[in-house]
Amino acid sequence: MNVYWFQDLKTGHLKQVQALLDQLKKEIELSITTINCSNHESLPDVLPNENQFNGPSILIGAGHDVYSKILQAKKYLKKYTSKDIFSIAVLRPSYKLNSFDLIVAPEHDFRKRRLPKNVILFQGSLASTSHDPVNENKGIIAIGGPSKHYNFDQEILMNQLHYILSVHPKHEFKIFNSRRTPDALNLKLKNEIDNYPNVQFIHLDSSESDTFQDSLNKSSLKFVTPDSSNLVFEALSAKGQTFLIQIERSTYTRIFGAKKIRESMNELVNTKRVGVVSILNKKGGIDISKIENPSLHFEPLAEVEKVSFSIMKFINHQK
């Protein structure tokens, strides 16, 4: 089957679509063509003409900049073929929901909305499932950055990191930053982490950043800042224990941003799917960190497998 992947070059969007296509490849042979929507090329320049078109196709992508391109492409291709063309939006578009054959979206996007019949829901974010055994002596810390969902307090985060490392002296830790991690925090991490012989800070721009997925899959302890839903659900899609790191003061009052990400993180905490590195405010204004462990009874999330199965079921029913 032909796949035309419309891309907006945002890492979180690309990783989720990639995880889904990798899973679909296990079910059906795919020929994938990527289309960079930021290049503003005309559809005839990037899509096959009537002499090149062969077989059914999937038009897929994530992000508001690509959804209109997917619908335009389907209309354009319909002029050249009677073959099936399936338009699939990954994440919830803000318009023309009924124009897509399928919408693959997180549950929190439809908690207070009517659920259209063409929507396939999943929990959190799409990530490849790993059943690799973990190394009980290894840990990973994944750091995001400022977002509209959380007040990213760098001082609190550094205190939390020192606490995590102090109570796990026998684990070998790798700390990874992200594109949103502030430069000042990167500098602090580099300078202060050098004091720990069992810790390595890996900057996003270094060649070793490619080891992130392998480290995530094989680490028994995974500590993640809650500002990045994608990072959290990537961790939960592998074996081991996942912990959210509190990054804002307990007295902080949130006055901006969408509630849905915070509600999603709170649900993970309440169901014990994740542990928490929290801050307790003692009398006298002393902040004390505390680690609460997650339940050990959960298997890795397999949301991408469920979504892939539903997509294949839909496509097969159209034949």
Residue ranges and their predicted role:
Residues 209-211, 230-231, 242-244, 248-257, ...:
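Short glycine/proline-centered loop/turn elements that form peptide/ligand docking sites
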Residues 217-219, 237-241:
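Conserved donor-binding/catalytic loop of nucleotide-activated donor transferases
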Residues 262-319:
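Leloir-type glycosyltransferase catalytic cores
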Residues 189-231:
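Donor nucleotide-activated moiety binding/catalytic core segment of transferases
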Residues 5-122:
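Active-site and donor-binding regions of nucleotide-sugar-utilizing enzymes
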Residues 146-179:
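Conserved catalytic-core segment of nucleotide-activated headgroup transferases in glycan assembly
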Residues 18-24, 72-76, 102, 112, ...:
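Short, aromatic/basic amphipathic alpha-helical patches
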Residues 97-155:
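A nucleotide-sugar donor-handling region in carbohydrate enzymes
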